[in-house]
């Protein structure tokens, strides 16, 4: 799942994302490797601690972030929050929370973009496009697998923000060509 809807009202849309099963499995696998190396080695206690802490460090580094997106029409802002356990441990609890605040009126479009994920193939993410030409992803990492989950979140945001795409001139001409001719237009 890309993001879960925490709350949805006419003025507020709150989306959340937590590390997925793949991320937690990787954490358990790497950490158990360190524990097994420490348990089965004949090394001193210092080396055993090094094995465990080294693998814990690598495991936490590979853990995905917790992410939130809060769209609030009453304040006119969207708040994108990210919490990283790795940054929290690395900076000794001083950092780990990143936050981006943007005005809702600046959002022009919501798109789904494809991103290449090293070793695994393709991933998808929602990208917010702003009036300034700047774009920002809704989450920091792409989700693997079904594009439909990501498209559903993009449609939810688009409908909440009431962003309706205007037809381009070429789309208008194509739709008028496909319409049946009126009674006076037949030859």
UniProtKB/Swiss-Prot annotation:
Alphabetized UniProt keyword annotations: Chaperone, Endoplasmic reticulum, Immunity, Innate immunity, Membrane, Phosphoprotein, Transmembrane, Transmembrane helix
Pfam families associated with the record: Cybc1_Eros
Transmembrane segments: 20-42
Annotated segments matching region Disordered: 167-187
GO biological process: one example: respiratory burst after phagocytosis
Modification Phosphoserine occurs at: 168, 170
Localisation per UniProt entry: Endoplasmic reticulum membrane
Membrane topology reported for the UniProt record: Single-pass membrane protein
Main localization (coarse): endoplasmic reticulum
Gene Ontology CC entries for this record: endoplasmic reticulum; endoplasmic reticulum membrane
Function: Functions as a chaperone necessary for a stable expression of the CYBA and CYBB subunits of the cytochrome b-245 heterodimer. Controls the phagocyte respiratory burst and is essential for innate immunity.
Family: Belongs to the CYBC1 family.
Subunit structure: Interacts with CYBB; CYBC1 may act as a chaperone stabilizing Cytochrome b-245 heterodimer.
Name of the featured protein: Cytochrome b-245 chaperone 1
Organism of this sequence: Rattus norvegicus (Rat)
């Amino acid at each position: 799942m890309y993001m879960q809807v925490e709350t949805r009202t006419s003025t507020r849309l709150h989306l959340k994302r937590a590390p997925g099963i793949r991320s937690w499995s990787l954490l358990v696998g790497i950490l158990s490797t360190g524990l097994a190396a420490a348990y089965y080695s004949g090394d001193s206690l210092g080396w055993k601690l090094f094995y465990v802490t080294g693998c814990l460090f690598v495991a936490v580094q590979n853990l995905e972030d917790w992410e939130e997106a809060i769209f609030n029409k009453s304040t006119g802002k969207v708040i994108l929050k990210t919490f990283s356990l790795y940054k929290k441990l690395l900076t000794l609890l001083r950092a780990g929370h990143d936050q981006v605040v943007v005005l809702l009126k600046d959002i022009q479009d919501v798109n789904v973009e494809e991103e290449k994920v090293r070793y695994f193939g393709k991933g998808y993410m929602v990208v917010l496009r702003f009036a300034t030409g700047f774009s920002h992803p809704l989450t920091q990492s792409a989700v693997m697998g079904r594009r439909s989950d990501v498209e559903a979140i993009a449609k939810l945001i688009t409908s909440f923000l009431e962003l309706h795409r205007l037809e381009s001139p070429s789309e208008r001409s194509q739709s008028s060509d496909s319409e049946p001719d009126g009674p006076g237009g037949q030859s």
